[in-house]
Amino acid sequence: MSNIYIQEPPTNGKVLLKTTAGDIDIELWSKEAPKACRNFIQLCLEAYYDNTIFHRVVPGFIVQGGDPTGTGSGGESIYGAPFKDEFHSRLRFNRRGLVAMANAGSHDNGSQFFFTLGRADELNNKHTIFGKVTGDTVYNMLRLSEVDIDDEERPHNPHKIKSCEVLFNPFDDIIPREIKRPKKEKPEEEVKKLKPKGTKNFSLLSFGEEAEEEEEEVNRVSQSMKGKSKSSHDLLKDDPHLSSVPVVESEKGDAAGDLDDDGEDESAEYDEYVDGDEKNLMRERIAKKLKKDTSANVKSAGEGEVEKKSVSRSEELRKEARQLKRELLAAKQKKVENEAKQAEKRSEEEEATPDGAVAEYRREKQKYEALRKQQSKKGTSREDQTLALLNQFKSKLTQAIAETPENDIPETEVEDDEGWMSHVLQFEDKSRKVKDASMQDSDTFEIYDPRNPVNKRRREESKKLMREKKERR
């Protein structure tokens, strides 16, 4: 695959297509196909491709888009007419990820383009290759083909281009046009036909006369109430059930007997108009209403008591938690004190024993415990202490080296812990001597003396071997 990339010329220009399948980076061959690249870049700058769909998908072959109508037969170039094809000997349809112009014939290029999904040798010298998909965005390009298509190679749910962004424009003289897109004609608003009001035929009803009288009364009241807000007293002046005297509600906390008495007092004003049955009905209604109010008050009071109980319960739990914390802390402190007392008793008992080895062990233990207590905790003080110990060790080393002479280095004993400080590592130098060709010394030239007995013996042996070889032949 690398030999294919090497054969392709370098690119000059870059565009980013933001699609519903992901971003797609396109690098352009603006020197090899200048007209196609100029057309593509200017259409991207003019947002010509925004919200256009990929209307044609051939799996394993191409994905085509760039038609604002979405039919496959639309789209115009920036030149106002189709422009010529631009073929190049180093640009071939030999792999996926190539971007080329779609056309209906030779020299019929507009705004539509397509991506290749594989090798397509049959398209060579028929379509202008002007770009390639780069990087990992090639996988987003492949996702464009992962849709269901019909018999006409049109996807059921096509992907679309959301927007275009020109990252590098090799043409500095491009001036985007102001394209006036035709507005979609809104459908004519349907005229709502007012349905004529149907006339009510009361003669068909058994109680037609009464219903007709009620209808006339309602119409008369509605006509008189237009533009005004009135109470029920104003609306129903002739209603015997309503009194012109305002009713004063008794307190909600009164007993049921008081409510009945108040109802009797108020009903005395219109006994002339109301029958006994109607009076009982009114009493029942008022009693029900007041019962509802009292039940609501009881509920609210019960809820308040529940809230108070829950608050008091939570306070008790908090107090118990605080008390438990105090008890735990006290028990912990008591445990620490008991352990300290037991340790003191043990130390006193151990000191009382006269054994020398045990006494020495205790002294060493106390010594290390004292050192451990002197060590500070982690932090800046601990770091300072570590640096101080390091400097102390360095000074000790330099002092040991200065005290011991370089030439006379005595062998240290195993028990001498400080002998290693002044010890110097020495070993035999076994490195080979490298001969310099420019320097001539006694070892430069090889000396061969034929009179040397060793050389004589070697010559005789070699002659003997040669004779034996000849005899064998």
UniProtKB/Swiss-Prot annotation:
Cited InterPro entries: Cyclophilin-like_dom_sf, Cyclophilin-type_PPIase_CS, Cyclophilin-type_PPIase_dom, Cyclophilin_A-like
Residues with the N-acetylserine modification: 2
PPIase cyclophilin-type domain sequence ranges: 11-166
Ranges annotated as biased composition (Acidic residues): 257-275, 405-419
Keywords of this entry: Acetylation, Coiled coil, Nucleus, Phosphoprotein
Region spans: Disordered: 177-386, 399-473
A biological process term (GO) from this entry: protein folding
Domain of life: Eukaryota
UniProt function note: As part of the spliceosome, plays a role in pre-mRNA splicing. Probable inactive PPIase with no peptidyl-prolyl cis-trans isomerase activity. As a component of the minor spliceosome, involved in the splicing of U12-type introns in pre-mRNAs.
Description of how the protein assembles with itself and partners: Part of the activated spliceosome B/catalytic step 1 spliceosome, one of the forms of the spliceosome which has a well-formed active site but still cannot catalyze the branching reaction and is composed at least of 52 proteins, the U2, U5 and U6 snRNAs and the pre-mRNA. Recruited during early steps of activated spliceosome B maturation, it is probably one of the first proteins released from this complex as he matures to the spliceosome C complex. Component of the minor spliceosome, which splices U12-type introns.
Name listed for the protein in its UniProt record: Spliceosome-associated protein CWC27 homolog
Species, as recorded: Macaca fascicularis
Taxonomic lineage from the root: Eukaryota, Metazoa, Chordata, Craniata, Vertebrata
Gene giving rise to this polypeptide: CWC27
